Amino acid sequence: MEEIQRYLQLERYHQHDFLYPLIFQEYIYTFAHDRDYNRSILSENSCYEKKFSLLIVKRLITRMYQQNHFLIFSNDSNQNPFEGRNKNFYFQIISEGFALIAEIPFSRRLRASLKEKKIVKFQNLRSIQAIFSFLEDSFSHLNFVLDILIPHSVHVEILVQTLRYWVKDASSLHLLRFFLNEYCNSNSLITPKEVSSSFSTKRNKRLFLFLYNSHVCEYESILVFLRKQSSHLRSTSSGLLLERIYFYAKIERLVNLFVKVKGFQVNLWLVKEPCMHYVRYQRKSIWASNGASLLIKKWKSYLVAFWQWHFSMWFHPRRISINQLSNHSLEFLGYHSSVRMNPSVVRSQSLENSFLINNALKKFDTLVPIISLIAALAQAKFCNVLGDPISKPVWADLSDSNIIYRFGHICRNLSHYYSGSSKKNSLYRIKYILRLSCARTLARKHKSTVRAFLKKLGSELLEEFLMSEKDVLSLTFPKASSIFGGGYRRQIWYLDIISINDLANHKSKF
């Protein structure tokens, strides 16, 4: 974002967030394309990369300047100035530009807040694996958890109205509204099915994910406000990431909300619960508390009422499940997480007698979801549904070094992402599947057997790109690796991971 802002010359637009002229700048679409280019090696659809060119962007901008927007998205090839091009392709280009431009006000205000609060290492706050270190410290002392699936069916107009609090530029909002209505139809809802079918790649979904997250931020900011009003402690992280410039002007509306919801204002003591913890990623959110089951049930009913009254959206109570942490496993960020009892025996020796004391300590466990990972690998054609490795024919035409690089890239990413697993056996099985699938792909290319191929070239060919966890740790912490010795088998959380792994997220409904 720093490199982008050097080229944008936003100073004259800063006062009023006047972003409309940026929509007609070629470098906006170039930055948007380069930012996400080839991010995922699992993506085999290179159609967009082959079609993208600045000439197409120039023609598209010229058409937008002429304000003949309907001609851009017309199904009639006689009216479409870009014959032979898929209409979705132009939606894709424009959505990338919109997403990049809409993120500018958020980025500016976040950086201003960081500078004001003198927070230098913001990268650590961005890491999604920082959540697990928090869960390890907090969840082992809690009793109940609310597993929440946030509503996703949001009308286009609601998303645009939410964005108005951040972007004051009416021209940009009108063009965005027109674009969304043309794509999704004004009477339809943005659902995961529509997003996944119309925006089949992550790059296409970026705009809709941004709009959806800004909508959820509205809900989270109110919860942060309630928490601050009821507690003398101030959460630095929540105040930083969810701080809203316009929010305190909406307090009157918030009070009216509590008056409408029966019993909400009387029972506002709920938010004073000192051990209520909240985390979210995409549509999945978790509330945990050490309170009684009655308190958790009241929170569930109030959350449902909160969504229905404030957002005018139907929130089905079955979207919130109440579970006890001692016998429930959470599926969050690609991990199976649970709190289990870890028994330990301590011998106490006195002058005359000795005693054996049995202690049961709670431990937060994070496990690799082996079944879902094998299903993801089978869907990507690395193995069958039983987990038996197979060759990947679509990569057989690539060079040997390219094949090795692709398999090694996936293997290292999975090892990096699941380094926090309590048990490594499942991760070793995933490595085995990828290693043998790579060997079979190379053998298929050279029309040989796996055994003959490995005997001819040697096992070093595969070992050089499948880096072990010990090697990763020694590269990351060169001084500490010699001290810890075998400690690389322990849980390690990396603060450079800012998004969930593609294979770990293949079952995501969003």
From Swiss-Prot:
Keyword Chloroplast attached: yes
Keywords, alphabetical: Chloroplast, mRNA processing, Plastid, RNA-binding, tRNA processing
Domain of life: Eukaryota
Disulfide bonds: none
GO molecular function: RNA binding
Gene Ontology, cellular component aspect: chloroplast
GO biological-process terms attached to the record: mRNA processing; RNA splicing; tRNA processing
Subcellular location per the Swiss-Prot or TrEMBL entry: Plastid, Chloroplast
Summary of the function given for this chain in its UniProt record: Usually encoded in the trnK tRNA gene intron. Probably assists in splicing its own and other chloroplast group II introns.
HAMAP family for the chain: MatK
Membership in a protein family: Belongs to the intron maturase 2 family. MatK subfamily.
Annotated protein name in UniProt: Maturase K
Lineage of producing organism: Eukaryota, Viridiplantae, Streptophyta, Embryophyta, Tracheophyta
